[in-house]
Amino acid sequence: MSLVYMNIIMAFTTSLVGLLMYRSHLMSSLLCLEGMMLSLFIMATLIILNAHFTLASMMPIILLVFAACEAALGLSLLVMVSNTYGTDYVQSLNLLQC
């Protein structure tokens, strides 16, 4: 396995561990999710470029669209929770009665 792939897998794993460990604040959870999506995007792009998959060339773009939608929803939820309760704790999400 190439050193580039190992670094990307390590970045994904580090973001996943960060998401599992620092889940008390919503902002840190969102940053870890963005790190995971970025490493998935880079990995998908490298695999498609190295394997010359012409039919799957749209997959990284679709992944970026989903990452942008996830970021927009997460930031809007962060703004709503911080304006309503004054904190960005994930425990405040249980009070929203969604």
UniProtKB/Swiss-Prot annotation:
It catalyses: a ubiquinone + NADH + 5 H(+)(in) = a ubiquinol + NAD(+) + 4 H(+)(out). Its EC number is 7.1.1.2. Keywords: Electron transport, Membrane, Mitochondrion, Mitochondrion inner membrane, NAD, Respiratory chain, Translocase, Transmembrane, Transmembrane helix, Transport, Ubiquinone. The chain crosses the membrane at residues 1-21, 29-49, 61-81. The keyword Electron transport applies. It is found in: Mitochondrion inner membrane. GO terms for biological process: ATP synthesis coupled electron transport. It is an enzyme of class 7 (translocase). It is a multi-pass membrane protein. Pfam families: Oxidored_q2. One of its GO terms (cellular component) is mitochondrial inner membrane. One of its GO terms (molecular function) is NADH dehydrogenase (ubiquinone) activity. Core subunit of the mitochondrial membrane respiratory chain NADH dehydrogenase (Complex I) which catalyzes electron transfer from NADH through the respiratory chain, using ubiquinone as an electron acceptor. Part of the enzyme membrane arm which is embedded in the lipid bilayer and involved in proton translocation. Belongs to the complex I subunit 4L family. Core subunit of respiratory chain NADH dehydrogenase (Complex I) which is composed of 45 different subunits. This is NADH-ubiquinone oxidoreductase chain 4L. It comes from Hippopotamus amphibius (Hippopotamus). The gene is MT-ND4L.
